[in-house]
Every structure is written in C-alpha cells, then in structure tokens.
Swiss-Prot record:
InterPro entries, sorted: Glyco_trans_1 (IPR001296), GS/SS (IPR011835), Starch_synth_cat_dom (IPR013534)
Gene coding for it: glgA
Entry keyword set: Glycogen biosynthesis, Glycosyltransferase, Transferase
Enzyme Commission no: 2.4.1.21
Stored PANTHER family: GLYCOGEN SYNTHASE 2-RELATED (PTHR46083:SF1), PTHR46083
GO molecular function terms attached to this record: alpha-1,4-glucan glucosyltransferase (ADP-glucose donor) activity; alpha-1,4-glucan glucosyltransferase (UDP-glucose donor) activity
Protein name: Glycogen synthase
Pfam families: Glyco_transf_5 (PF08323), Glycos_transf_1 (PF00534)
Length: 475
C-alpha cells in the first residue's frame, strides 16, 4: 500500500508539540510493512543533516495566488521517504524562525496547494493521510473532479479547538471549484471559510487521537456550524489512541538518566525504587533541591491555558504545605502567563523543594521522568496526551484530569489518580492529597500502580494496526 502522510510537524526535525511525535510515530510504524512517504513544508529550522540519501528532486508548478513553482527533495529516512517541499521564494512564506506565525492559514494553504500538485504527479497513491487543520485545504483539492486519480483521504483532528478560519477569497486562488469551496464556507458569513470544516466534508474518513476525545468533539457546541459538520460525518469518524515510540522512550537505554532501569526489575521492587531514587538524587543535586523532600512530583508541559496553569500554581502551594518536592519543566507562549510564571520562578529560586524551569530541555525532561514518583497533568482538555504514557513507561504514576486521552489511559486505583472534569480546586487538591498519602502510607498499593503503568503497552504497533484497519476499509 502506498501511503502519504502530510503535516507541518515531524519529529525530530520540525516539532512544536505532540503533533510532530504522532506523525513520526505513525509513519515509522506503518513503514515496517508499507510504502510510506511523508510530505513536509520547508522551514529554515529543518536541517537535513541526517545521513540520508537524496533519492529524487522535482520542480513543479501549482496554483495559489497565481501560478507558483515549488522544489521538492526526497530523502530515504528510516525505511520511509521524507519529502520536503520548498515553495517559490516569490511568496516568501516559510522563511520564519518559528513553525507557527500569525499568517498560518495563508502559509499552510499554500503548502496544501503545492502538496496537491506534487501528489498529482505521482504514479499511484492509495492513501493520503492529512494531519490537523493546517492540511485542511489539501483534502478538498484532492477531491476535485479534474484529478488524474483519486487517493482515499484520511484526516486526523489533533486539536478541535484550532480550526483555521480564513477568507474564502484566499482559498479560491488555489484553483478549487466553487462546489469544492462551498464545503469550507461559513453559512453565516460566506466571505469566511474554515479549513477544518472543509476537511471534515471532503475526507473519506476522519479520526482523532483518542476515543473519549472523539465523544467530546461530538458534544462540542462552541461553533454550531462546526458541530453540524462533525455530526454530518459522524458515521465515518472515530478516535484512535496515540502511542509512543518505546525505543525512544525507554528507561533501560535512556542516556539522560543517571541510572538506567527497566520493567524487568518489577520482580525486585526494592532494586527498582533504589534506581529511581538514584535518579532523584542526581536531579536534586542538579537543581539544588533538598534531599529530605519526598515524594517528587513533576509537571512536564507547555504552560498555556489548555494545560491548566492555575492548577499548576495550586500544586505549588500544595507541595509547600505538604512537604514534598515539585519540579515544573515547560515553555510559555502567552506573554501574561510567561510574566506570572517568571515571577513565580524567581520567587522560588532558593526554595528547598520547588523548581520551575521555563525552557523545555529534553535531557533534563528525561531525567525528571526517571526521577519523579508522580507526574501531574491538570489540562482542561487533552485530546490524547503523551506525557502520561511516557511517565508510566518510566514508573512515574500519573495524576490527571479525567478528560480526552487522559481518561482513556489513566484509572484511579489501577495505574494512577484522576479528578473530575469540573474546575473544582477541591477535587484537584483531594487527588493530590490521596496520591501523596498513598505513596507515604501504602507502599504495596503504590507499587501496584507503578507495576500496572510499566507493564502497559503504549507502543506504536497498536495505533498503526487501527489505522491500517481504516485504510483497508476504504480500498
């Protein structure tokens, strides 16, 4: 089967969040038994310094704001083809130093138009799998009646809150027909279009990244036209849980840990916990924390509204009052949140048990996973979430809000602790207290939580099998 995956992120070369990990992970898993090609826009951030062979180059034209040209370079990479498409410099859309800007609907629609032209020149494609609203226009362009062939179109919603609102006139410059364009237009304002809306109507099948998040999307009434669109397509919509690359996320081989360990040590829990304690000591020494504070809770997250920054602050106070350690590692994108957390960071510089690191540092984050006893994820909503899966892999018990993929993967008393979907701080603080008390007073129960998490299979194979089931149902 010839499968094309297309997105604007692909770990490790261009990544801002979980999207890059998910696209890489799925592509890698599928490439073990199928012909997989990944299409990415060129960014200055992408530096193909990897030792991959250039296997093809093309120059081709496409329609978007007039006749444009693009240059594609295809590399052989980890059993798949990685094709980077550089748009004509006349538009100068991808010379930015960041993945995302204020002109993203323009930039990613132009890339979608170029990707459609590139795919049209290929001899045969069975499946085109498009990821998130950025690729929304591509679905409509691939459905146009003048296409030389019609690959089946799969679209995955990674975050339903981001939809790609833009002008209808802009999309019309891609050469899409009036009928195709109507799938994107808003009824309430035909001069405006939504990339995600059009993708829902134009794709053969739609997925999202967890079963519970799929139900939450169906119950989302924040925009009645988007609700109508997803309800009209609910018979070809499902949630497939993301996985993690268990080779990349492996405490047995992770070079960032002070001491390695594995689930094989579950037969010798004292040895397992001793090794985690050694990682904890290494982290405490690195961050200047006092060894007397235990357990260690961590938060590894983007610090944005979605992730519940007000609950993170509540966790800081709870840690101070209850004598345990808390380490927060994350990046802020909102200036106001950045200001507040920078002030918190500075005020806690000499704290014996709290540290805030406002910079995502992968080796440090990995050491935190290996050192921590528990990981807290208080997100207001979480389409899937990967940090709870990584945490369990490293023997770190997740404490989460019961929403989206967190609800699908964490069960109180089985492999972690949960609190309700309401914004009730008492529920959240009760969860924290229960977790701390269990750790301190019920070591046998705590070990069972760790064991269940470490034995859980969260790899890529299961995710790939589910997607192959969708692909095969369409062919």
């Amino acid at each position: 089967m010839k499968i094309i995956q297309t997105a604007v992120e692909f770990a490790p070369f261009i990544k801002a969040g979980g999207l890059g990990d998910a696209v890489y992970g799925l592509s890698k898993a599928l490439s073990e038994s199928h012909d997989v090609e990944v299409l990415l826009p060129f960014f200055p951030l992408i530096t193909p310094s990897f030792s991959s062979q250039v296997i093809d180059e093309k120059v081709f034209s496409y329609e978007f704001l007039g006749r444009q040209h693009a240059h594609s370079i295809s590399y052989s990479y980890e059993g798949m083809i990685l094709t980077i498409i550089k748009l004509d410099s006349q538009l100068d859309l991808f010379s930015t130093s960041t993945i995302y800007t204020e002109d993203d609907t323009l930039r990613f629609s132009a890339f979608s138009a170029a990707a459609a032209a590139y795919i049209g020149e290929l001899d045969h494609v069975d499946i085109v799998h498009m990821h998130d609203w950025h690729m929304g226009l591509l679905s409509g362009l691939l459905k146009e009646p003048n296409r030389p062939h019609y690959p089946k179109r799969i679209f995955t919603i990674h975050n339903f809150s981001y939809r790609g609102y833009c002008s209808t006139q802009l999309l019309g410059t891609s050469g899409i027909s009036d009928f195709g364009l109507s799938n994107y237009q808003l009824y309430r304002d035909p001069q405006m279009s939504v990339l995600l809306k059009g993708a829902l109507y134009c794709s053969d099948y739609i997925t999202t990244v967890s079963p519970t998040y799929a139900q939450e999307i169906l119950n989302d009434y924040s925009d009645y036209e988007m609700h109508d669109a997803i309800m009209a397509r609910r018979h070809v919509f499902c949630g497939i849980l993301n996985g993690i690359d268990e080779q990349i996320w492996n405490p047995e081989t992770d070079a960032s840990l002070a001491v390695n360990y594995s689930k094989d040590l579950l037969d010798a829990p004292d040895v397992l916990f001793t090794k985690k304690e050694e990682n904890k000591n290494a982290l405490y020494e690195k961050l200047g924390l006092s060894y007397e504070y235990s357990p260690l809770m961590c938060i590894i997250s983007r610090i944005v509204e979605q992730k519940g920054p007000e609950f993170m602050k509540a966790a800081i106070l709870h840690a101070m009052e209850n004598g345990y350690a808390l380490v927060i590692v994350g990046t802020c994108y909102d200036p106001e949140i950045q200001r507040k957390f920078t002030n918190l960071q500075e005020s806690l510089t000499t704290s014996p048990n709290i540290r805030i690191i406002l910079d995502y540092n992968d080796p440090l984050a990995r050491l935190v996973y290996g050192a921590a006893d528990m990981i807290c994820i208080p997100s207001h909503f979480e389409p899937c979430g990967l940090t709870q899966l990584i945490g369990m892999r490293y023997g770190t018990v997740p404490l989460v809000r019961s929403t989206g993929g967190l609800a699908d993967t964490v069960v109180t008393g089985i492999n972690g602790f949960t609190f309700s979907q309401t914004d009730n701080f008492n529920d959240f603080l009760h969860m924290l207290t229960l977790a701390i008390t269990t750790y301190r007073q019920e070591p046998d129960i705590w070990f069972q939580l760790v064991e269940e998490g470490m034995l859980r299979s969260s790899g890529l194979t299961t995710m790939a099998i589910h997607y192959l089931g969708v692909y095969n149902s369409l062919l």
